[in-house]
């Protein structure tokens, strides 16, 4: 059997030298929220633990201020 080489995911925020994640930067936050409105885990995105905590806090603040939805748009 041939082993598949899995590319190591890297932390985008570390590479760009971001100091703090802003809750008003909605374009960045939307990339880390799934279609159902859940925060995507760091094992999938490759985000480091420090920035994953900041990301979760920023997403929760944006949700509370109604900048991001809590869940997806339900069609009835």
From Swiss-Prot:
One of its GO terms (biological process) is translation. Pfam families: Ribosomal_S18. GO terms for cellular component: cytosolic small ribosomal subunit. The keyword Ribosomal protein applies. Keywords: Ribonucleoprotein, Ribosomal protein, RNA-binding, rRNA-binding. PROSITE patterns: RIBOSOMAL_S18. GO terms for molecular function: small ribosomal subunit rRNA binding; structural constituent of ribosome. PANTHER family: 30S RIBOSOMAL PROTEIN S18 (PTHR13479), SMALL RIBOSOMAL SUBUNIT PROTEIN BS18M (PTHR13479:SF40). Binds as a heterodimer with protein bS6 to the central domain of the 16S rRNA, where it helps stabilize the platform of the 30S subunit. Belongs to the bacterial ribosomal protein bS18 family. Part of the 30S ribosomal subunit. Forms a tight heterodimer with protein bS6. This is Small ribosomal subunit protein bS18. It comes from Methylococcus capsulatus (strain ATCC 33009 / NCIMB 11132 / Bath).
């Amino acid at each position: 059997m041939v082993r598949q080489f899995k590319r190591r995911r890297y932390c985008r925020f570390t590479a760009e030298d971001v100091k703090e994640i802003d809750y008003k930067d909605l374009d960045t936050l939307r990339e880390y929220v799934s279609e159902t409105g859940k925060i995507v885990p760091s094992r999938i995105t490759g985000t480091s633990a420090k920035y994953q905590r900041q990301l979760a806090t920023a997403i929760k603040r944006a949700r509370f201020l109604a900048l991001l939805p809590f869940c997806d748009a339900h069609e009835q």
